[in-house]
UniProtKB/Swiss-Prot annotation:
Signal peptide: none annotated. The active site is at residues 26, 101. Its EC number is 4.2.1.10. The gene is aroQ. Homododecamer. GO terms for molecular function: 3-dehydroquinate dehydratase activity. CDD domains: DHQase_II. This is 3-dehydroquinate dehydratase.
């Protein structure tokens, strides 16, 4: 795989509160800890990992429009169930992506069961906590290496 392979990691609203927000659903790890570990794993695989977390939808859309990444890992958080604009941004750049959720959204409130992203995602990982991000990164690396 090329040394220039790049993955964009997108985290949506309220994920900046990981580690203290509803740890029963989201775990005790902070977003910084998760991203640091993923960055190390990506670097070891020869992949660059870029990360954005925002509570503002437009900032996530702008990051998608501006990226030169070949793969996206996205935890849209609450935007999962509401954001046609974020979905359209990903479809507009035609970059393959995996959707990740820390909690099992299907075992939670009914409004969390619908995703505007799942039908277009290469895959969806939910309910495995922070480990889901690592599985998504492994799948992204495999996908990128298969293409080269």
């Amino acid at each position: 795989m090329s040394q220039t392979a790049k993955v964009l990691l997108i985290n949506g609203p309220n994920l900046n509160l990981l580690g203290r927000r509803e740890p029963g659903h989201y775990g005790h790890q902070t977003l910084t800890t998760i991203v640091d570990e993923l960055t190390r794993n990506a670097t070891q695989a020869g992949v660059t990992l870029e990360h954005i977390q925002s509570n503002a939808e437009y900032q996530l859309i702008d990051a998608i429009h501006a990226t030169d990444a070949q793969f996206i890992i996205i935890n849209p958080a609450a935007f999962t169930h509401t954001s046609v604009a974020l979905r359209d941004a990903i479809l507009g750049v035609a970059i393959p992506f995996i959707e990740v959720h820390l909690s099992n959204v299907h075992a939670r409130e009914p409004f969390r069961h619908h995703s505007y992203f799942s039908d277009k995602a290469l895959g969806v990982i939910c309910g495995l906590g922070a480990q889901g991000y690592d599985f998504a990164l492994q799948a992204a690396i495999k996908h990128l290496s298969d293409k080269h």
